[in-house]
């Protein structure tokens, strides 16, 4: 809703880079050893892409807290053990990555400190201010006056994603 994914895509566009997006939900498998293979496979594919491309692509983990979250101590369940093993593999891969890694999350407080240390830059995107919200309303809904867009920006402290959802819903309701 605040533009994390869009910022990544615009950064890639502006720098002429491809984005290798990881669907975090597809990493976790109920089958023993499959998640670990998936993670190792992701980094192998990314390393191969880096060798083939003129410009290094961006490795993009959206909603990264699902796999970069705080590790558990004294784990007894097989699911928790699998997640800890998965996280250890991720930590090893991140130690040696030669590329551009971007991770997004709405829950930065849930990230494991070992992962956080490996992120050189941390950028927090807040909800847009009143003026930017007015511009977002204007870009998504045509036919209103500047004063009306300003009023919407003032009245509704929404994120860009929330504004987009309101506009979509109103379009569907109109139909």
Give residue spans per PLM region:
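Conserved AAA+ ATPase small/helical "lid" subdomain
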Residues: 123, 144-175
